[in-house]
Amino acid sequence: MSKSILKKEIFKIIAKSLSIPEKMINENVSSNNYEEWDSMSHLNILIALDKKLSGKAQKIQELSEAYSVKKIIQILEKKKLLK
């Protein structure tokens, strides 16, 4: 577990949560363009991020409403949790 995360680790978490190949993940992926990104997948993303960030993600309210890779990255950058 870590106190910060790399973009490629975010991509890997999202790919696994959406059950799609990691090579398909980029900053434009969102719930608007991937039907796989439903509420259950979003919850799985949040749980995996929280585990990777040693419990820090659960304290970031904005993540619960971040339904895109770009938004997740922006929030983690703002909170200084992105390497």
Residue map of PLM features:
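Phosphopantetheine-dependent thiolation modules in NRPS/PKS and related acyl-activating systems
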Residues: 2-47, 51-83
